[in-house]
């Protein structure tokens, strides 16, 4: 996005004869009234005074935002320490989030949740991720698990699992990806064979977030090897004992190893191995085999909206850090925010973040209205992820050499931002979804 400097053709000294090939009166009028250096300077000054623009939230969502903004702010400094030490987020912090209702935010009240919409999910995810992406991502696994069970579970499964997920008693994790299966889930090979009243699972999974601490795995497996592609896949609600630091994977038939990562720490990433791992047959999601991919697809819209919100939070964190540093850092007798190349970056970061935030809200409102929103969700995720990376890169540039030092939180925000273009649907997949839907619409 705004990683490149903005230069208009006339600023390069091109003659009007050249400009005339692509300019007309309407375009010239827009340029004349559009963004210029004084506008960028004024916007940066407004930001420095704490004015970030109206977000359009109603009173309830403003209260939700303020609550989680305070919570994230209280843990921001500690979070950088967790990142540097590659520590798990403390369990007492997770319990505090549970007490605030994060894990049951969108679960219906009839199943023990708060019954709020995806717009509330966006607000909470953004504010927590603004403090630390790990905090904003703790709710992702609960959101995915609850969405799977709500959309595809039996009434007994809903009654058994949803209230426990909502309270944080149960910490779920999504177990989908395999070493040779990223976006192409149709080639998934982990097998689940029915033996009496159990399924025995054999295979390998990778990039599983928070796996050691999880109590419940939404486990995508192949139950029918004779059916090609997606048709033979099923989703299991696989229980396991919660691991400890000394024994992260105590379950029989299951092993795991940590994957060292640049950023997105706090929950840790794991490779998992299954060798006859037993799952109660009653925990087949929906009670019908072969529905796994359909179940999973039903979660894509919500998951991508929530990831877009996390990206907006990371981008806002980058802006906070970049602006704060630009105000504090003195060069040539004045704060570096006074220099055009700096306030220009800050102004464009703010404008782009607002754009991503509003697209995220629009997708959430579309979802809350019960309408199809894979196009909007894909757009929100694609745009917000790119803006988060751009904002982090620009904020590092504002910090200069200090931005490359690990003691400065912007170094963490940079590596956290990078994953957003990769997970929950890579940027290339999002672009393909968007293009396909646009072609369908004609």
Show where each model-derived region lies:
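A short, Trp-centered hydrophobic/proline-enriched beta-strand micro-motif
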Residues: 168-176, 220
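Short Gly/Pro-enriched turn/cap motifs at secondary-structure boundaries
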Residues: 180-183, 207-210, 225-227, 261-268
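N-terminal glycine-rich flavin-associated loop
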Residues: 136-156, 182-185, 198
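Long, acidic (Asp/Glu-rich), low-complexity accessory segments flanking structured domains
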Residues: 275-294
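Alpha-helical interface subdomain recognition
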Residues: 1-130, 135, 152-153, 164-168, ...
């Amino acid at each position: 996005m705004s990683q490149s400097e903005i230069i208009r053709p006339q600023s390069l000294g091109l003659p009007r004869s050249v400009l005339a090939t692509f300019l007309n009166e309407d375009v010239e009028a827009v340029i004349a009234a559009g963004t210029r250096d004084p506008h960028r300077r004024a916007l940066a000054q407004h930001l420095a005074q704490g004015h970030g623009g109206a977000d359009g939230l109603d009173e309830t969502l403003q209260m939700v935002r303020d609550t989680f903004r305070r919570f994230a702010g209280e843990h921001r400094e500690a979070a950088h320490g967790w990142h540097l030490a590659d520590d798990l987020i403390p369990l007492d912090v997770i319990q505090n989030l549970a007490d605030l209702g994060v894990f049951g935010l969108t679960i219906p009240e009839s199943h023990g949740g708060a019954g709020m919409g995806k717009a509330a999910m966006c607000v909470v995810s953004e504010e927590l991720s603004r403090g630390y992406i790990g905090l904003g991502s703790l709710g992702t696994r609960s959101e995915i698990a609850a969405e799977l069970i709500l959309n595809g579970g039996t009434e007994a499964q809903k009654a058994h699992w949803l209230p426990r997920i909502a309270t944080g008693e149960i910490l779920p994790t999504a177990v989908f990806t395999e070493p040779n299966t990223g976006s192409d889930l149709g080639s998934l090979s982990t097998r689940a064979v029915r033996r009496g009243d159990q399924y025995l699972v054999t295979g390998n999974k990778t990039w599983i977030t928070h796996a050691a601490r999880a109590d419940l795995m939404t486990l995508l497996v192949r139950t029918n090897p004779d059916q090609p592609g997606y048709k033979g896949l099923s989703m299991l609600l696989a229980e396991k004992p919660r691991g400890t630091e000394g024994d992260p994977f105590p379950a029989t038939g299951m092993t795991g190893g940590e994957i060292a990562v640049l950023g997105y720490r706090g929950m840790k990433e794991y490779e998992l191995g299954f060798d006859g791992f037993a799952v109660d047959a009653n925990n087949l999601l929906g009670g019908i085999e072969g529905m796994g991919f359909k179940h999973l697809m039903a979660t894509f819209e919500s998951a991508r909206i929530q990831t877009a919100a996390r990206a907006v939070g990371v981008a806002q964190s980058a802006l906070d850090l970049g602006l704060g540093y630009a105000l504090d850092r003195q060069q040539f007798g004045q704060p570096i925010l006074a220099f055009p190349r700096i306030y220009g970056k800050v102004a464009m970061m703010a404008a782009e973040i607002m754009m991503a935030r509003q697209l995220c809200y629009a997708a959430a409102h579309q979802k809350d209205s019960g309408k199809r929103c894979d196009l909007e969700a894909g757009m929100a995720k694609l745009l917000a992820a790119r803006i988060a990376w751009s904002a982090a890169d620009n904020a590092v540039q504002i910090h200069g050499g200090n931005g490359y030092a690990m003691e400065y939180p912007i170094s963490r925000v940079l590596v956290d931002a990078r994953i957003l273009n990769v997970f929950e649907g890579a940027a290339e997949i999002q672009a393909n979804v968007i293009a396909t839907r646009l072609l369908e619409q004609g």
